[in-house]
Amino acid sequence: MDKFLIKMPIKPKNNETPEQKPMVKKETPKAAAKQSNKNTPIQAKEKENAQENDTPKQGRAGRSAKPAAKRKNLDTFEVNKEKNTAESENPPKRRSGRLTRSTRSMAEEGTPSPEKVKPEKLPFIKYRGAIKYFTENQDIAASADDVMQWVDKQTDVDVVPMAFDMEWPFSFQTGPGKSSVIQICVDEKCCYVYQLTNLKKLPAALVALINHPKVRLHGVNIKADFRKLQRDFPEVSADALIEKCVDLGVWCNEICETGGRWSLERLANFIAKKAMDKSKKVRMSKWHVIPLDENQLMYAAIDVYIGQVIYRDLEQREKQKLINELQFKEQNGEAAFKAVKGLGETFLSKINEVTL
């Protein structure tokens, strides 16, 4: 009930007077501030100067900046040296390049392909052989017949390798044009360039040459060339040519036990230790225009010439590899051969003995 009681003031008696406490006026902060601000003009000026020296300067956004004496000079030699040391010890992470379906390796698992390594400076290929260039149907047929007769005379071998390549114009507006040039090489001393612009149909002698049972056509990504040739000239059967052709990139992966997809230029770097002048101006030139100029003819000839050189080199490596593997098995046994093979040995060079 106490909370409902109201305390009433007690009235003093008639004879008693209430004691009055002295009134003390409390100073509020504002009043104190006003009182402290009352200075003479000289004192106010001195106070302003002192505040300018003690308070930091204001930045653009009103933020107080650090005193100039305490600011660290980021351009000094010591700071740059510390930054370089820190970056070398902990290099910044880079976003890895994302592989797309077109750039992803289509080869089987194996040692990473040396084509991904930046090639060293190599001497450019110099072709000094003959270039036989034909544009008319009857001339192309006669030349193909001569090559076929030369193939028939190679009685000491079962297979005659022939480098094969094609060229055609390309436009970013209309895409690839019709197959315009076929170049072949059966001997490193002579290359044949056949321009197909005036041909509605391939000569029968040329079709017979590329389908000769003794001829082994080879190149880089050669299967795609055969499919395009069949689209442009239906008298050619791409499937029959694909069955007996050799893709130099795939063959290199089998022999050297590398991986990945190869270009002719990178394959020339790795196998032949030569550089190719793949000028975009020549590569994207008008291959359908007659006649071809000297740069175009040399470009076409070098493509099949270096292809023939690479084939011969891989052929020798394959033979030597088989010999080394056979000798190792005879000396160390099948179990040791499998163990060493599992460690990544390619047997491209001879191994005399092994300790397991």
Curated annotation (Swiss-Prot):
Keyword check for Lipoprotein: no
Pfam families, per database record: DNA_pol_A_exo1
Region spans: Disordered: 1-117
Keyword Nuclease: yes
GO-annotated biological processes: negative regulation of mitotic recombination; nucleobase-containing compound metabolic process
InterPro entries: 3'-5'_exonuclease_dom, 3-5_Exonuclease_domain, RNaseH-like_sf, RNaseH_sf
UniProt subcellular location: Nucleus
Broad class of the protein's primary localization: nucleus
The protein's name in its UniProt record: 3'-5' exonuclease
Gene from which the chain derives: WRNexo
